[in-house]
Regions:
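C-terminal soluble interaction/assembly domains
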Residues: 292-295
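A common structural junction motif
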Residues: 12-20, 113-121, 241-252
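Helix N-cap motif at beta-to-alpha junctions
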Residues: 99-104, 229-232
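Non-catalytic beta-strand/loop surface segments
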Residues: 1, 38-91, 116-164, 182-234, ...
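Single conserved hydrophobic/aromatic residue that forms the stacking wall/gate
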Residues: 1-10, 14
Length: 336
């Protein structure tokens, strides 16, 4: 009964009967703008937004998910309603079901709930491909606070690219295992990673983490470093470059690769251990590749070799393919 109730609620959305009351639209606009303004007080949000703008010139990945403030102010109720009427349609949706159920009965239930919904006439969407970065770009932000941050982002492959799995293992070796999306796991330390040992244990940094994401189109591989109060971003960048050069020039020992695979595999297991996350990942994988991507994820990680890691480092982790960003704290109330 719970499944049917939730499915019925979801079908109400796709019946396209929501009214988008103008007063409710204005109320939500206020909430979202307030959320954005709160994020603008966070140094890493400001730095990340500026770096995405620098990394992409044409692709929508140029923009943060929450959008630009000027767009939030400009968008009208009719714009939202038309988007809803066009895209919230059964021919633009994927239903995923995870849990204890009988397949035949579940399919009948889904047909009963969704079967009468009318498809929408979907416009052809053309997303302009982003040209490769050919020169290192730099972003520097200053503002209130006491902490310096260094963030370096490299162009990374899409989730359905054959290099993605080797890149995932490289990330685990370099900065520690990281969640592929918001439905990630936890409890896996990155203290055995190369950058933790090179930066945190030497007190050049307070923390370091990476974060390869599973995306539809090629996105970014960010490495974020919180600089130690007595150190500089430039010193940390030099050490980062040294560790990347090691990956490019020296084969990673097999034992280190197996440990990294084990950590990445464990994090993925934590992130998909409950049925909500399983349903999310099945649907999400179907969007950017197919659900087989999820089914074979662990097996693909286990195929990665030292040669693969070296090739990924040589191909993707090059200075011309990156944006270097620094947030420098000041005593000012505002920033540049």
């Amino acid at each position: 009964r719970s499944t049917q109730s939730r499915s019925s609620a979801a079908s109400d959305v796709y019946k396209r009967q929501s009214l988008f009351d103008p007063q409710e639209v204005e109320s939500e606009r206020t909430v979202i703008i307030s959320e954005r303004e709160g994020s603008e007080n966070e140094p890493l949000f400001r730095l990340d937004e500026a770096m995405q703008m620098a990394a992409f010139e044409k692709h929508p990945y140029r923009y943060e998910v929450i959008g630009l403030k000027e767009d939030l102010l400009r968008i009208q109720r009719d714009d939202l309603y038309q988007h809803y009427r066009t895209y919230y349609a059964p021919n633009n949706a994927i239903v995923t079901v995870a849990g204890d159920f009988q397949t035949k009965e579940m399919l009948a239930q889904l047909r009963e709930i969704y079967g009468d919904l009318k498809p929408s006439s979907l416009p052809e969407v053309h997303i302009e491909s982003e040209p490769p970065l050919s020169k290192e770009r730099h972003v520097e932000i200053s503002g209130p606070g006491e902490t310096t941050y260094l963030r370096v982002v490299y162009r990374a492959p899409a989730a359905n690219h054959s290099d993605f799995f080797a890149f995932t293992v490289l990330d685990s070796i370099l900065s520690g295992p990281a969640s592929l999306n918001m439905f990630g796991g936890g409890g896996i330390s990155n203290k055995t990673s190369r950058l933790y040992r090179a930066l945190v244990e030497t007190e050049l940094a307070v923390s370091v983490y990476g974060g390869l994401q599973a995306t539809v189109d090629p996105f970014l591989y960010p490495i974020t470093i919180t600089i130690h109060p007595r150190q500089t971003a430039e010193a940390a960048l030099s050490v980062l470059d040294r560790e990347i050069q090691r990956l490019q020039q020296e084969a990673v020992p097999e034992a280190e690769i197996q440990r990294a695979i084990k950590q990445a595999r464990a994090l993925f297991a934590y992130g998909s251990e409950n049925i909500t996350n399983q349903a999310f990942w099945l649907g999400y994988a179907e969007i950017f590749a197919s659900y087989d991507w999820l089914i074979h994820y662990v097996q693909e990680l286990e195929k990665v070799t030292p040669t693969d890691i070296q090739r990924i480092a040589q191909t993707y982790l090059q200075p011309p393919r990156r944006v270097v960003g620094i947030y420098r704290p000041t005593n000012m109330l505002g920033g540049n």
